[in-house]
């Protein structure tokens, strides 16, 4: 059941918010507000070290000595948090590794930080998601 409430914003903030709505192609302000609220609660789950889901992506030089072994070893150290991995050969030199993870936020962050710190990793990202349990 939806509940209606109102908020007050100054003109400048409302203008910025309406630009955001247009850029993201929301149908209305309510959808945009709901999305912002959900994102805030997902962030809170991570801050409170709750059970979360996430996606770690890495781009690395596969010619870097021992890097693939280090990536694999670190994943094995956190095997109980890894749901799935996908490895893509981007070109002759670069690989993309996508790792779907689940577990306590602190453990997931530790894995992501460990992978990002490896010599030869050119780019890394952790997309922080929720398990969905608290977003009804």
Swiss-Prot record:
SUPFAM superfamilies per UniProt: ACT-like, Ribbon-helix-helix
Instruction: Locate the residues binding Ni(2+).
Output: 76, 87, 89, 95
Please name the CDD domains in this protein's record.
RHH_NikR_HicB-like (cd22231)
Record-linked Gene3D superfamilies: ACT-like. Chain A, domain 2, Met repressor-like
Kindly list the cofactors needed.
Ni(2+)
The membrane spanning regions, by residue number, are: none
Keyword Glycoprotein present in the record's keywords: the answer is: no
Instruction: List, in alphabetical order, the GO biological process terms annotated in this UniProt record.
Output: response to nickel cation
GO MF entries: DNA binding; DNA-binding transcription factor activity; nickel cation binding
Q: Fetch the PANTHER family from UniProt.
A: NICKEL-RESPONSIVE REGULATOR (PTHR34719:SF2)
Q: What is this protein called?
A: Putative nickel-responsive regulator
The organism encoding this protein is Desulfotalea psychrophila (strain LSv54 / DSM 12343)
């Amino acid at each position: 059941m939806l509940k209606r409430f109102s908020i007050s914003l100054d003109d400048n903030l409302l203008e910025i918010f309406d630009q955001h709505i247009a850029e993201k192609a929301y149908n209305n302000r309510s959808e945009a507000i709901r999305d912002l609220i959900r994102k805030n609660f997902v962030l809170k789950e991570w801050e409170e070290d709750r059970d979360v889901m996430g996606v770690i992506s890495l781009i690395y030089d596969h010619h870097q000595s021992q890097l693939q072994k280090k990536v694999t070893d670190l994943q094995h150290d956190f095997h109980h948090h890894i749901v799935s991995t996908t490895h893509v050969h981007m070109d002759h030199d670069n690989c993309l590794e996508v790792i779907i993870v689940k577990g306590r936020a602190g453990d997931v962050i530790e894995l992501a930080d460990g992978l990002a710190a490896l010599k030869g990793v050119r780019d890394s990202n952790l997309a922080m998601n929720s398990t969905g349990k608290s977003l009804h």
